Amino acid sequence: MSAAGTTKGVTQFHLRHFILRASAEPAIMAKWANNLQELCESTRLGIPAIVASNPRNHVTTDASVGLSVGLTAFSKWPGELGLAAMRDFTLTRKFAETASAEWRAVGLRKGYMYMADLATEPRWGRVEGTFGEDADLASKMITEIVLGFQGNKLSNTSVAMTTKHFPGGGPQVDGQDSHFDWGKFAHYPGGMFDYHVKPFKAAIAAGTSAIMPYYSAPKGKGFEEVGFSYNKAMIGDLLQDKLGFHGIINSDTGPIEMMPWGVENISIPERYKKALNAGVDIFSGAADPTTLIEVVKSGLVSEERINQSVAKLLKEKFDLGLFENPYVNVDAAMKTVGNKEAVAAADLALRKSIVLLRNDDKRLPLAKKTKVYFETYFQSGRNAGGEAIKVSKPNYPGLEFVSTKEEADVVLLWLVPTSGGLFSSQGSKIDLNLSKNRIDVNHVNEVLNAKPTIVAINYTNPWVIEEIDKGKATSIIATFGTTKEALLDIVTGAYKPTGKMPFTTPVNQAAVEANKSDVPGYMEGPGYGLFAFGHGLSY
């Protein structure tokens, strides 16, 4: 994958599409965007730039380059799974409209988002970015997201969406991800290929500006076993001809040089030719266009074919109003990003996203004056020797927070399991037991046996909790990227839980390994699930 500084990209390589992965204060982002547009305006044709980003409005555990920016100055909403857990489509639209306004204020006019993939393979490392395992729910979420960010059509009040990853990245073999050679294949053992396409149909109906194919190659199904960016049957025949999508086909980052699955043995110029013939309009991660220009000059690809893609890219800019006025108001950006109304709406969503899974002893909600020992257990694995346990004593009305378990009437134990993030993968077997995801289950069981305990678990995958579910875990809460304040409002009843599970959690690792990767958990049959899709209690 090539890279170039912004000025060099504009003046030497004539680039006009950029992705901003950094997190900065709104004023800095707005000034940078204006400087970029001023540079573009000074060139021969004055074609404006369009700046894209991955999601940057979510509380997330495993934020990393290419997935999510993580916490920023923008309003902080639940993770995508949490948005789905709300089952509130009006608030979902509010989220999208709010985030769209924040993005536009700093000059971000294109989103590499959202994921229409379905979380049917519980081991997949990108489940956190999905709207769960159910195609109907994901379709409704994607519809509200696209309409909220873009409006009914692209305009100067839109952020253009790039719905991903066609035709659905969920059904990966053994849950391995196709960023890597050992995860290059998607498969459909349950025969549910069409199920995974359904949310993309919703995105198309809502008017998504672009669609991004995944790196994966289809295993079986009679399709050519090449990555979806090279796969004419998937892009040209299915997405464009059958589904009627005529917007931009935006490759994921680096399929030409880094993830050329199925075309490893052909030259880079031939890879460009194959991807263009399949239907790709723009290549992410290819900052230096020299090779692509040679592909055209040599006659491998016609200039007419390139012009078809250029027309789409220019039309998007025209529709967004960038040719009329690409600049933003720095003062307005500072007032818009993270404004009070946005924060209030996000705070409501953070509470609505929380799911009460179990309340067998009716311990919840906690009575006033309860003495609480509040411990968060999170070991990211990125800081060797870092302290996993953090004890919180927030100033929260009605409860008394204490420093030790011994002083407490009840323990609130918030577990944040993590595999270490998608890019920590080395191709080894994926195990969803808590002990394999940086949780000391001996410590958890000691706490459970010592004191009445409320266990909150942050789900970025459908974790297997068998190791701690031995009769003492009678109060369990699911979070999907939220805040301590929101969690405390749930446990006290200041906000009554309303969330519903966006996926099914497997009862044990054997169920995980026996699952059919393209089949949602609620269709796996008896004996698979512990907490079912749609499960959620209240007071």
Predicted regions and their residues:
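N-terminal beta-rich core of secreted/periplasmic extracellular enzymes
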Residues: 1-167, 197-210, 227-285, 297, ...
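Gly-rich Lys/Arg/Thr-decorated short loops/hinges at beta-loop-alpha junctions or inter-strand turns
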Residues: 13, 75-79, 121-126, 173-184, ...
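Short coil/turn segments at secondary-structure boundaries
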Residues: 47-52, 215, 287-288, 308-309, ...
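Short acidic/His/Gly/Ser-rich catalytic and metal-binding motifs that mark active-site loops
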Residues: 59-63, 119-123, 169-175, 220, ...
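C-terminal non-catalytic regions of proteins with extracellular/luminal or membrane-system context
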Residues: 105, 259-260, 265, 290-303, ...
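Short beta-alpha connecting loops at secondary-structure transitions
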Residues: 126, 182-188, 220-225, 257-280, ...
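Structured secondary-structure scaffolds
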Residues: 179-200
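Surface-exposed extracellular loop regions of Gram-negative outer-membrane beta-barrel proteins
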Residues: 210-213, 217
